[in-house]
Swiss-Prot record:
The chain crosses the membrane at residues 2-22. Keywords: Membrane, Transmembrane, Transmembrane helix. GO terms for cellular component: membrane. It is a single-pass membrane protein. This is Uncharacterized protein R372. The keyword Membrane applies. It comes from Acanthamoeba polyphaga mimivirus. It is found in: Membrane. The keyword Protease does not apply. SUPFAM superfamilies: Cysteine proteinases. Disulfide bonds: none annotated.
Length: 250
């Protein structure tokens, strides 16, 4: 009986999500106001970069993406950090396995389960654009994080793997559509020192660098960076720019 109830609830949720998807699906208007080449010199260590996806491999992938982005009024589904080192720009990010550009990115283990990677920024933009036709956005940090501090804070995450996707989707669903407090409590219960999400990595590193304040890292979703309330979790001596959307023209 309990199993039937659970199955019924899942079916109702899936049907509801599909209805919301078809009712709200709209073509994304290209609203980028900058070109990458015009803002390239502004990037520095500690900037937060966001990625969106406009092309999906399957309808199921599109529904999953919709449920954690457009359903809550967001456009971006992935987040990473910028590193400027010796005039070169890199994205430091936590991704699943075979993320766009993985063939040229540097990873720190070969477990085949994703994790932290380093990739040149322009390569990441080019590969992401090729696979997903995405657009991008950045928040520029007011004061660059010294590279020695940045390296020290990211190195402890090198051998972790990407978080379980079912767990990730469950936390996202509860946080966005049910109750934030419940999701926060579950995130604490589910906490695993060996696994991370992209947002969790970004928040943990910036928090360790004293750039942003405490927040449940496991449920630090990309849309939070896009949200106007983002400034509420900044340290008093650090600020970030408004969200700057941009396109990359290879």
């Amino acid at each position: 009986m309990i199993l039937r109830i659970i199955i019924f609830v899942i079916i109702i949720l899936v049907v509801s999500l599909l209805l919301i998807y078809f009712v709200n699906k709209k073509p994304i208007i290209n609203t980028q106001i900058e070109n990458y080449s015009d803002i390239k010199n502004k990037f520095k260590t500690g900037d937060i970069i966001l990625f969106s996806c406009r092309k999906h491999n399957t309808f199921i992938d599109e529904i999953k993406y919709f449920s954690r982005t457009k359903l809550i009024g967001s456009e971006f589904g992935h987040v990473g950090l910028i590193l400027r080192d010796k005039k070169k720009l890199y994205v430091i990010e936590f991704t699943d396995y075979e993320h766009p550009g993985d063939q040229v990115a540097k990873r720190y283990h070969d477990l085949g389960k994703g994790g932290m990677r380093v990739i040149e920024l322009e390569t990441a933009l080019r590969e992401y654009n090729k696979d997903h036709m995405g657009c991008y956005a950045v928040r520029f940090i007011s004061q660059e994080i010294p590279n020695d501090i940045f390296y020290d804070k990211i190195k402890k995450h090198r051998h972790k793997i990407f978080e379980s996707k079912p767990k990730l989707l469950l936390l996202a669903f509860i946080d966005m559509l049910v109750m934030h407090k419940m999701s926060s409590d579950l995130a604490t219960i589910f906490h695993n020192e060996d696994r991370m999400t992209c947002g969790e990595f970004v928040h943990t590193v910036l928090n360790d660098c004293n750039a942003i304040a405490d927040y449940p890292s496991k449920i630090f979703w990309p849309y939070i960076v896009e949200d106007s309330d983002f400034n509420k979790i900044l340290r008093s001596d650090i600020s970030y720019s408004r969200l700057v959307k941009f396109i990359f023209d290879p």
